[in-house]
Amino acid sequence: MEHFHQIQQTIQHYQQQLAAQQQQQVQQQQLQQHQVVVQQNQQQAHQNSSNTTAGVGTQQLFTYKMASSFPNPATTMAQVVATSNAAGTTGYDYRLNMAQAAAAAAVPGSQWWYSAANQGQVDANTAAQLQHQQQQQQQQQQQQQQQHQQQQQMQQQQQQQNVINSASPMSRVKADAKPRGRMTAYAYFVQTCREEHKKKHPDETVIFAEFSRKCAERWKTMVDKEKKRFHEMAEKDKQRYEAEMQNYVPPKGAVVGRGKKRKQIKDPNAPKRSLSAFFWFCNDERNKVKALNPEFGVGDIAKELGRKWSDVDPEVKQKYESMAERDKARYEREMTEYKTSGKIAMSAPSMQASMQAQAQKAALLAAAAQQQHQQLEEQHDDDDGDGDDDENQ
Protein backbone atom coordinates (compact mmCIF):
# COMPACT_ATOMS: atom_id res chain seq x y z
CA MET A 1 0.00 0.00 0.00
CA GLU A 2 2.78 2.39 0.88
CA HIS A 3 4.55 1.47 -2.37
CA PHE A 4 1.36 2.35 -4.26
CA HIS A 5 1.18 5.78 -2.58
CA GLN A 6 4.86 6.41 -3.37
CA ILE A 7 4.23 5.61 -7.03
CA GLN A 8 1.32 8.07 -7.04
CA GLN A 9 3.46 10.81 -5.47
CA THR A 10 6.30 10.18 -7.95
CA ILE A 11 3.92 10.40 -10.91
CA GLN A 12 2.35 13.60 -9.57
CA HIS A 13 5.85 15.06 -9.15
CA TYR A 14 6.73 14.20 -12.76
CA GLN A 15 3.47 15.69 -14.00
CA GLN A 16 4.14 18.94 -12.10
CA GLN A 17 7.63 19.14 -13.61
CA LEU A 18 6.23 18.62 -17.10
CA ALA A 19 3.60 21.31 -16.55
CA ALA A 20 6.28 23.74 -15.33
CA GLN A 21 8.48 22.99 -18.36
CA GLN A 22 5.57 23.50 -20.74
CA GLN A 23 4.73 26.83 -19.09
CA GLN A 24 8.35 27.97 -19.43
CA GLN A 25 8.38 27.00 -23.09
CA VAL A 26 5.16 28.96 -23.71
CA GLN A 27 6.70 32.02 -22.06
CA GLN A 28 9.87 31.63 -24.15
CA GLN A 29 7.79 31.37 -27.33
CA GLN A 30 5.86 34.52 -26.43
CA LEU A 31 9.13 36.36 -25.75
CA GLN A 32 10.61 35.19 -29.06
CA GLN A 33 7.49 36.29 -30.94
CA HIS A 34 7.71 39.72 -29.31
CA GLN A 35 11.37 39.98 -30.31
CA VAL A 36 10.49 38.99 -33.87
CA VAL A 37 7.83 41.73 -34.04
CA VAL A 38 10.31 44.33 -32.73
CA GLN A 39 12.92 43.22 -35.27
CA GLN A 40 10.40 43.43 -38.09
CA ASN A 41 9.43 46.96 -37.06
CA GLN A 42 13.09 47.98 -36.97
CA GLN A 43 13.71 46.39 -40.35
CA GLN A 44 10.71 48.19 -41.83
CA ALA A 45 11.92 51.53 -40.50
CA HIS A 46 15.41 50.87 -41.84
CA GLN A 47 13.96 49.87 -45.21
CA ASN A 48 11.93 53.06 -45.42
CA SER A 49 15.02 55.11 -44.59
CA SER A 50 17.07 53.28 -47.24
CA ASN A 51 14.37 53.80 -49.88
CA THR A 52 14.27 57.54 -49.12
CA THR A 53 18.06 57.86 -49.44
CA ALA A 54 18.14 55.82 -52.63
CA GLY A 55 15.39 57.99 -54.11
CA VAL A 56 17.35 61.17 -53.44
CA GLY A 57 20.46 59.71 -55.08
CA THR A 58 18.41 58.62 -58.08
CA GLN A 59 16.91 62.08 -58.46
CA GLN A 60 20.36 63.67 -58.30
CA LEU A 61 21.71 61.20 -60.84
CA PHE A 62 18.76 61.88 -63.11
CA THR A 63 19.47 65.63 -62.86
CA TYR A 64 23.11 65.05 -63.71
CA LYS A 65 22.15 62.99 -66.74
CA MET A 66 19.90 65.73 -67.91
CA ALA A 67 22.74 68.21 -67.52
CA SER A 68 25.04 65.98 -69.59
CA SER A 69 23.06 66.94 -72.67
CA PHE A 70 24.44 70.45 -72.41
CA PRO A 71 27.84 71.05 -74.03
CA ASN A 72 30.92 71.52 -71.90
CA PRO A 73 32.96 74.49 -73.10
CA ALA A 74 36.21 72.80 -72.12
CA THR A 75 35.69 69.76 -74.32
CA THR A 76 33.14 70.40 -77.05
CA MET A 77 33.40 74.08 -77.89
CA ALA A 78 37.09 74.32 -78.71
CA GLN A 79 36.56 74.39 -82.53
CA VAL A 80 33.39 76.49 -82.56
CA VAL A 81 33.40 79.38 -85.05
CA ALA A 82 33.16 82.79 -83.43
CA THR A 83 29.72 84.33 -83.28
CA SER A 84 28.44 87.74 -82.50
CA ASN A 85 29.38 87.60 -78.84
CA ALA A 86 31.85 85.89 -76.47
CA ALA A 87 29.26 83.51 -75.07
CA GLY A 88 28.75 82.01 -78.46
CA THR A 89 32.49 81.35 -78.75
CA THR A 90 33.16 79.79 -75.36
CA GLY A 91 29.72 78.50 -74.58
CA TYR A 92 27.85 78.88 -71.34
CA ASP A 93 29.41 77.78 -68.07
CA TYR A 94 26.82 76.56 -65.57
CA ARG A 95 29.21 76.35 -62.60
CA LEU A 96 27.81 78.89 -60.11
CA ASN A 97 28.35 82.01 -62.29
CA MET A 98 32.14 81.71 -62.39
CA ALA A 99 34.05 84.20 -64.50
CA GLN A 100 34.86 83.17 -68.05
CA ALA A 101 38.63 83.49 -67.61
CA ALA A 102 38.63 81.46 -64.40
CA ALA A 103 36.45 78.85 -66.02
CA ALA A 104 38.78 78.55 -68.98
CA ALA A 105 41.80 78.31 -66.69
CA ALA A 106 40.27 75.55 -64.55
CA VAL A 107 39.36 72.95 -67.11
CA PRO A 108 38.13 69.77 -65.34
CA GLY A 109 39.53 66.38 -66.26
CA SER A 110 36.07 64.78 -66.22
CA GLN A 111 32.52 65.92 -66.36
CA TRP A 112 32.08 68.25 -63.44
CA TRP A 113 28.42 67.50 -62.72
CA TYR A 114 29.18 63.94 -61.45
CA SER A 115 29.98 64.51 -57.79
CA ALA A 116 32.35 61.92 -56.27
CA ALA A 117 30.73 62.34 -52.84
CA ASN A 118 27.26 61.61 -54.21
CA GLN A 119 28.49 58.57 -56.13
CA GLY A 120 30.14 57.18 -52.96
CA GLN A 121 26.89 57.69 -51.05
CA VAL A 122 24.97 55.72 -53.66
CA ASP A 123 27.48 52.85 -53.51
CA ALA A 124 27.34 52.84 -49.71
CA ASN A 125 23.52 52.69 -49.74
CA THR A 126 23.57 49.77 -52.17
CA ALA A 127 26.07 47.84 -50.05
CA ALA A 128 24.00 48.54 -46.92
CA GLN A 129 20.86 47.22 -48.59
CA LEU A 130 22.61 44.02 -49.66
CA GLN A 131 23.98 43.49 -46.16
CA HIS A 132 20.57 44.14 -44.64
CA GLN A 133 18.94 41.59 -46.96
CA GLN A 134 21.54 38.98 -46.00
CA GLN A 135 20.89 39.62 -42.31
CA GLN A 136 17.15 39.21 -42.85
CA GLN A 137 17.67 35.89 -44.61
CA GLN A 138 19.89 34.63 -41.79
CA GLN A 139 17.34 35.68 -39.17
CA GLN A 140 14.54 33.92 -41.04
CA GLN A 141 16.59 30.73 -41.25
CA GLN A 142 17.35 30.88 -37.52
CA GLN A 143 13.67 31.42 -36.71
CA GLN A 144 12.67 28.44 -38.83
CA GLN A 145 15.25 26.25 -37.10
CA GLN A 146 14.02 27.36 -33.67
CA GLN A 147 10.41 26.65 -34.59
CA HIS A 148 11.38 23.18 -35.85
CA GLN A 149 13.25 22.43 -32.62
CA GLN A 150 10.32 23.64 -30.53
CA GLN A 151 7.92 21.41 -32.44
CA GLN A 152 10.19 18.41 -31.88
CA GLN A 153 10.41 19.17 -28.15
CA MET A 154 6.63 19.49 -27.90
CA GLN A 155 6.16 16.15 -29.66
CA GLN A 156 8.64 14.43 -27.34
CA GLN A 157 6.94 15.87 -24.27
CA GLN A 158 3.55 14.77 -25.56
CA GLN A 159 4.85 11.24 -26.08
CA GLN A 160 6.32 11.17 -22.56
CA GLN A 161 3.03 12.43 -21.15
CA ASN A 162 1.11 9.74 -23.01
CA VAL A 163 3.45 7.05 -21.67
CA ILE A 164 3.07 8.33 -18.11
CA ASN A 165 -0.72 8.51 -18.42
CA SER A 166 -0.93 4.98 -19.82
CA ALA A 167 1.34 3.55 -17.07
CA SER A 168 -0.12 5.65 -14.28
CA PRO A 169 -2.37 3.89 -11.78
CA MET A 170 -4.06 7.23 -11.15
CA SER A 171 -6.56 6.43 -13.89
CA ARG A 172 -7.74 3.46 -11.86
CA VAL A 173 -8.23 5.45 -8.68
CA LYS A 174 -11.84 6.06 -7.85
CA ALA A 175 -13.11 9.61 -8.10
CA ASP A 176 -14.93 9.36 -4.79
CA ALA A 177 -13.04 9.83 -1.51
CA LYS A 178 -13.66 6.35 -0.18
CA PRO A 179 -11.87 5.64 3.13
CA ARG A 180 -8.58 3.80 2.92
CA GLY A 181 -8.80 0.15 3.88
CA ARG A 182 -7.61 -0.92 7.31
CA MET A 183 -4.22 -2.52 7.82
CA THR A 184 -3.45 -5.68 9.77
CA ALA A 185 -0.80 -6.03 12.45
CA TYR A 186 1.41 -7.97 10.06
CA ALA A 187 1.07 -5.26 7.41
CA TYR A 188 2.26 -2.65 9.93
CA PHE A 189 5.16 -4.94 10.80
CA VAL A 190 6.20 -5.26 7.14
CA GLN A 191 5.91 -1.50 6.69
CA THR A 192 8.15 -0.90 9.71
CA CYS A 193 10.73 -3.40 8.43
CA ARG A 194 10.77 -1.68 5.06
CA GLU A 195 11.34 1.74 6.61
CA GLU A 196 14.18 0.40 8.76
CA HIS A 197 15.78 -1.25 5.73
CA LYS A 198 15.59 1.99 3.71
CA LYS A 199 17.27 3.94 6.52
CA LYS A 200 20.10 1.43 6.86
CA HIS A 201 20.55 0.73 3.14
CA PRO A 202 19.13 3.66 1.15
CA ASP A 203 20.87 2.73 -2.12
CA GLU A 204 20.17 -1.00 -2.07
CA THR A 205 17.56 -2.47 -4.41
CA VAL A 206 14.92 -4.47 -2.52
CA ILE A 207 13.85 -7.85 -3.95
CA PHE A 208 10.22 -8.15 -2.92
CA ALA A 209 10.05 -11.96 -2.72
CA GLU A 210 13.20 -12.25 -0.62
CA PHE A 211 12.19 -9.34 1.57
CA SER A 212 8.72 -10.82 2.20
CA ARG A 213 10.20 -14.19 3.09
CA LYS A 214 12.55 -12.66 5.65
CA CYS A 215 9.73 -10.61 7.15
CA ALA A 216 7.59 -13.74 7.49
CA GLU A 217 10.41 -15.66 9.19
CA ARG A 218 11.04 -12.82 11.60
CA TRP A 219 7.33 -12.47 12.40
CA LYS A 220 7.09 -16.16 13.29
CA THR A 221 9.96 -15.92 15.78
CA MET A 222 8.56 -12.85 17.55
CA VAL A 223 6.82 -13.27 20.92
CA ASP A 224 3.44 -11.80 21.79
CA LYS A 225 5.05 -8.91 23.66
CA GLU A 226 6.92 -7.84 20.54
CA LYS A 227 3.81 -8.12 18.38
CA LYS A 228 1.69 -6.16 20.85
CA ARG A 229 2.47 -2.71 19.45
CA PHE A 230 1.61 -3.80 15.92
CA HIS A 231 -1.73 -5.20 17.09
CA GLU A 232 -2.41 -1.88 18.83
CA MET A 233 -1.63 0.00 15.62
CA ALA A 234 -3.98 -2.30 13.70
CA GLU A 235 -6.73 -1.76 16.29
CA LYS A 236 -6.42 2.04 16.00
CA ASP A 237 -6.54 1.81 12.23
CA LYS A 238 -9.62 -0.39 12.47
CA GLN A 239 -11.37 2.23 14.62
CA ARG A 240 -10.37 4.91 12.13
CA TYR A 241 -11.73 2.89 9.23
CA GLU A 242 -15.03 2.16 10.95
CA ALA A 243 -15.51 5.84 11.87
CA GLU A 244 -14.78 6.98 8.31
CA MET A 245 -17.08 4.35 6.82
CA GLN A 246 -19.95 5.58 9.01
CA ASN A 247 -19.60 9.07 7.51
CA TYR A 248 -18.92 7.83 3.98
CA VAL A 249 -21.67 8.34 1.41
CA PRO A 250 -21.16 6.39 -1.85
CA PRO A 251 -21.62 8.35 -5.09
CA LYS A 252 -24.88 8.09 -6.95
CA GLY A 253 -25.11 4.91 -9.00
CA ALA A 254 -22.20 3.22 -7.24
CA VAL A 255 -22.48 -0.49 -6.42
CA VAL A 256 -21.52 -1.10 -2.80
CA GLY A 257 -19.87 -4.35 -1.78
CA ARG A 258 -18.80 -5.42 -5.27
CA GLY A 259 -15.72 -5.07 -7.41
CA LYS A 260 -12.15 -6.22 -7.13
CA LYS A 261 -10.81 -6.25 -3.59
CA ARG A 262 -7.51 -4.66 -2.74
CA LYS A 263 -4.73 -7.19 -2.42
CA GLN A 264 -3.30 -7.17 1.10
CA ILE A 265 -0.16 -8.72 2.52
CA LYS A 266 -0.92 -12.28 3.57
CA ASP A 267 -0.37 -13.16 7.20
CA PRO A 268 1.99 -16.18 7.40
CA ASN A 269 0.28 -17.24 10.63
CA ALA A 270 -3.12 -17.49 8.97
CA PRO A 271 -4.53 -21.05 8.85
CA LYS A 272 -3.58 -23.08 5.80
CA ARG A 273 -6.44 -23.99 3.50
CA SER A 274 -7.75 -27.53 3.50
CA LEU A 275 -6.73 -30.05 0.82
CA SER A 276 -9.02 -32.08 -1.40
CA ALA A 277 -9.13 -35.88 -1.49
CA PHE A 278 -7.13 -35.93 -4.72
CA PHE A 279 -4.25 -33.98 -3.20
CA TRP A 280 -4.13 -36.30 -0.19
CA PHE A 281 -3.98 -39.20 -2.65
CA CYS A 282 -1.13 -37.49 -4.54
CA ASN A 283 0.83 -37.05 -1.31
CA ASP A 284 0.82 -40.82 -0.77
CA GLU A 285 1.31 -41.99 -4.36
CA ARG A 286 3.80 -39.49 -5.78
CA ASN A 287 6.92 -41.19 -4.41
CA LYS A 288 5.71 -44.57 -5.66
CA VAL A 289 5.21 -43.26 -9.19
CA LYS A 290 8.66 -41.62 -9.17
CA ALA A 291 10.28 -44.85 -7.97
CA LEU A 292 8.63 -46.96 -10.68
CA ASN A 293 9.27 -44.39 -13.42
CA PRO A 294 12.50 -42.50 -12.67
CA GLU A 295 12.59 -41.06 -16.20
CA PHE A 296 9.25 -39.27 -15.70
CA GLY A 297 9.20 -35.52 -15.45
CA VAL A 298 6.85 -33.42 -13.36
CA GLY A 299 4.19 -33.34 -16.06
CA ASP A 300 4.36 -37.10 -16.62
CA ILE A 301 4.00 -37.74 -12.90
CA ALA A 302 0.94 -35.49 -12.72
CA LYS A 303 -0.67 -37.31 -15.65
CA GLU A 304 0.03 -40.71 -14.09
CA LEU A 305 -1.42 -39.62 -10.75
CA GLY A 306 -4.56 -38.38 -12.47
CA ARG A 307 -4.95 -41.70 -14.31
CA LYS A 308 -4.48 -43.72 -11.12
CA TRP A 309 -6.99 -41.58 -9.24
CA SER A 310 -9.64 -42.22 -11.89
CA ASP A 311 -8.99 -46.01 -11.63
CA VAL A 312 -8.80 -46.22 -7.82
CA ASP A 313 -11.30 -48.37 -5.92
CA PRO A 314 -14.24 -46.63 -4.26
CA GLU A 315 -13.12 -47.85 -0.84
CA VAL A 316 -9.67 -46.28 -1.24
CA LYS A 317 -11.22 -43.10 -2.58
CA GLN A 318 -13.53 -42.97 0.45
CA LYS A 319 -10.46 -43.07 2.69
CA TYR A 320 -9.00 -39.92 1.13
CA GLU A 321 -12.36 -38.20 1.11
CA SER A 322 -12.56 -38.77 4.86
CA MET A 323 -9.09 -37.25 5.24
CA ALA A 324 -10.26 -34.23 3.23
CA GLU A 325 -13.30 -33.84 5.49
CA ARG A 326 -11.15 -33.91 8.63
CA ASP A 327 -8.77 -31.37 7.11
CA LYS A 328 -11.69 -29.13 6.21
CA ALA A 329 -12.97 -29.30 9.80
CA ARG A 330 -9.46 -28.46 11.01
CA TYR A 331 -9.32 -25.40 8.76
CA GLU A 332 -12.70 -24.14 9.91
CA ARG A 333 -11.77 -24.59 13.57
CA GLU A 334 -8.41 -22.82 13.21
CA MET A 335 -9.97 -20.04 11.16
CA THR A 336 -12.53 -19.40 13.88
CA GLU A 337 -9.82 -19.21 16.52
CA TYR A 338 -7.72 -16.97 14.28
CA LYS A 339 -10.54 -14.49 13.76
CA THR A 340 -11.43 -14.32 17.45
CA SER A 341 -7.94 -14.04 18.92
CA GLY A 342 -5.76 -13.05 15.97
CA LYS A 343 -3.44 -15.95 16.74
CA ILE A 344 -2.94 -19.40 15.32
CA ALA A 345 -3.77 -22.46 17.39
CA MET A 346 -2.03 -25.06 15.28
CA SER A 347 0.16 -27.88 16.35
CA ALA A 348 3.61 -28.25 14.83
CA PRO A 349 2.83 -31.53 12.96
CA SER A 350 -0.34 -30.17 11.39
CA MET A 351 1.46 -26.97 10.33
CA GLN A 352 4.26 -28.96 8.72
CA ALA A 353 1.85 -31.26 6.91
CA SER A 354 -0.20 -28.33 5.65
CA MET A 355 2.88 -26.48 4.38
CA GLN A 356 4.07 -29.63 2.62
CA ALA A 357 0.68 -30.08 1.00
CA GLN A 358 0.71 -26.49 -0.23
CA ALA A 359 4.14 -26.99 -1.77
CA GLN A 360 3.00 -30.14 -3.54
CA LYS A 361 -0.08 -28.36 -4.82
CA ALA A 362 2.07 -25.62 -6.30
CA ALA A 363 4.33 -28.25 -7.91
CA LEU A 364 1.35 -29.93 -9.57
CA LEU A 365 0.09 -26.64 -10.95
CA ALA A 366 3.54 -25.86 -12.33
CA ALA A 367 3.73 -29.32 -13.91
CA ALA A 368 0.39 -28.85 -15.64
CA ALA A 369 1.48 -25.48 -17.01
CA GLN A 370 4.76 -26.95 -18.27
CA GLN A 371 2.95 -29.81 -19.97
CA GLN A 372 0.61 -27.43 -21.77
CA HIS A 373 3.59 -25.34 -22.90
CA GLN A 374 5.35 -28.43 -24.30
CA GLN A 375 2.25 -29.44 -26.24
CA LEU A 376 2.02 -25.99 -27.79
CA GLU A 377 5.68 -26.16 -28.83
CA GLU A 378 5.18 -29.59 -30.42
CA GLN A 379 2.18 -28.33 -32.37
CA HIS A 380 4.19 -25.33 -33.53
CA ASP A 381 7.12 -27.52 -34.71
CA ASP A 382 4.82 -29.89 -36.62
CA ASP A 383 2.94 -27.39 -38.77
CA ASP A 384 2.08 -29.83 -41.60
CA GLY A 385 0.52 -32.42 -39.27
CA ASP A 386 2.66 -35.36 -40.44
CA GLY A 387 4.03 -36.09 -36.96
CA ASP A 388 7.62 -35.19 -37.91
CA ASP A 389 9.66 -32.30 -36.68
CA ASP A 390 9.74 -29.88 -39.62
CA GLU A 391 12.95 -28.23 -38.49
CA ASN A 392 14.95 -31.49 -38.69
CA GLN A 393 13.93 -32.26 -42.27
From Swiss-Prot:
Protein's UniProt keywords contain rRNA-binding: no
Pfam families: HMG_box, HMG_box_2
Tree of life domain: Eukaryota
Gene Ontology BP annotations: chromatin remodeling; developmental process; leg disc development; negative regulation of antimicrobial humoral response; negative regulation of DNA-templated transcription; negative regulation of RNA polymerase II transcription preinitiation complex assembly; negative regulation of transcription by RNA polymerase II; segment specification
SMART domains from the UniProt entry: HMG
Subcellular location: Nucleus; Chromosome
Region (Disordered): 153-179, 364-393
Main localization category: nucleus
Gene3D superfamilies xrefs: High mobility group box domain
Keywords carried by this UniProt record: Chromosome, DNA-binding, Nucleus, Repeat
GO CC annotations on file: nucleoplasm; nucleus; polytene chromosome
UniProt DNA-binding region: 179-249, 271-339
PROSITE patterns in the cross-refs: HMG_BOX_1, HMG_BOX_2
Bias kind Acidic residues: ranges: 379-393
GO molecular function: DNA binding; DNA binding, bending; DNA-binding transcription factor binding; single-stranded DNA binding; TBP-class protein binding
Compositional bias per record (Low complexity), positions renumbered to this chain: 364-374
InterPro entries on file: HMG_box_dom, HMG_box_dom_sf, HMG_boxA_CS, HMGB
Family assignment from sequence similarity: Belongs to the HMGB family.
Function summary: Binds preferentially single-stranded DNA and unwinds double-stranded DNA.
Protein's UniProt name: High mobility group protein DSP1
Gene: Dsp1
